[in-house]
Amino acid sequence: MMLPSGHPKSRLMKNFTALGPYIREAQCEDTAFFFDCLAVCVNIKPAPEEREFWGWWLNLEDTGKAFSYEYHYGLFDKQGNWREEKIKGKAVIEQVENAKQAFHVRLEKLLRSLEPACTLVARP
């Protein structure tokens, strides 16, 4: 499938997968991509499948002229769902933000390296 930006979706998916464990292929749609990051475990005592995490998720869409994006912050709960929630604790906030910034830099670099190059534009 060719995207509005002129890039094949399969090639973009391969490139996005190479960015790390962020892309959630099952939650992507035709021109929309979903990324997330489980940055900080809330409590390591429960079994791994029952743990909750503080982190971020990103909705990215190919609009043709650019990729529009919107980040959200919150809690990844025991049911495997994101809930937009205020992150607690200065150290936790820093870790989540640092993880997001590191990813964003790599994403921007990847999009600029495409031929034709693409840019990121925050959704208003």
UniProtKB/Swiss-Prot annotation:
Subcellular localization(s) per the UniProt record: Cytoplasm
This protein's GO CC annotations: cytoplasm
Protein name per its UniProtKB record: Sigma factor-binding protein Crl
Principal place of residence: cytoplasm
Keyword annotations: Activator, Coiled coil, Cytoplasm, Transcription, Transcription regulation
InterPro entries, alphabetized: Tscrpt_reg_Crl (IPR009986), Tscrpt_reg_Crl_sf (IPR038208)
Any one GO BP annotation for this protein: positive regulation of DNA-templated transcription
Pfam families: Crl (PF07417)
Family: Belongs to the Crl family.
Keyword Coiled coil listed: yes
Sections of the chain in a coiled coil: 90-115
General function of this protein: Binds to the sigma-S subunit of RNA polymerase, activating expression of sigma-S-regulated genes. Stimulates RNA polymerase holoenzyme formation and may bind to several other sigma factors, such as sigma-70 and sigma-32.
Chain residue ranges for the region called Essential for activity: 99-118
Source species taxonomy: Bacteria, Pseudomonadati, Pseudomonadota, Gammaproteobacteria, Enterobacterales
Species in which this protein is naturally found: Pectobacterium atrosepticum (strain SCRI 1043 / ATCC BAA-672) (Erwinia carotovora subsp. atroseptica)
